[in-house]
Amino acid sequence: MAGWRVIVCGVAVVAATGCASMQSDSVGTTSLYERLGGKAAISAVVDDFIGNVAADSRINRRFAGADIPRLKRMLVDQICQATGGPCTYTGRSMVEAHRGMAVKEAEFDALVDDLVKSLDKFKVGAREKQELLGALGGMKPEIVGQ
């Protein structure tokens, strides 16, 4: 149960953390949160993403017994906050959250694949998708192998 929540949260925070740092590159530009369509659009992507993960035999065993409604709320808040939205994420750091889980690189990559499928399904623009995914590589060491 905890494994599911932590891995998915890890991906969301990884993606969202990078977005927060990238969105301020151009003063006066619309926030990534707004460009993504706000909380409703983020929620739709997260719902689809969770469905992809649940159907993914490479990683779904990590999420058996997870509190899915809570997981979705947490992911939405993480992405919302990190992309410049009005939400607040109060969860643990990626290192804390993944300590002792021994997340494998292949599992991390599978989660990223599932997120990309959702972003593509909702026709997220190339710039926004790049911002969301750009930080994944940098955060990977905080998640994989902990």
Where are the regions that the model predicts?
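Bacterial N-terminal signal peptides that target proteins for export
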Residues: 1-11
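C-terminal motif of bacterial Sec signal peptides marking the signal peptidase cleavage site
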Residues: 15-18
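Bacterial signal peptide processing site
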Residues: 20-23
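Post-signal peptide N-terminal segment of mature Sec-exported envelope proteins
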Residues: 25-52, 73
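A ubiquitous short alpha-helical element
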Residues: 30-36, 62-64, 96-104
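Extracellular zinc-dependent metalloprotease catalytic-domain scaffold
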Residues: 51, 133-134
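N-terminal, post-signal-peptide region of Sec/Tat-exported proteins
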Residues: 51-79
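Compact alpha-helical subdomains of small soluble proteins
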Residues: 68-129, 135-142
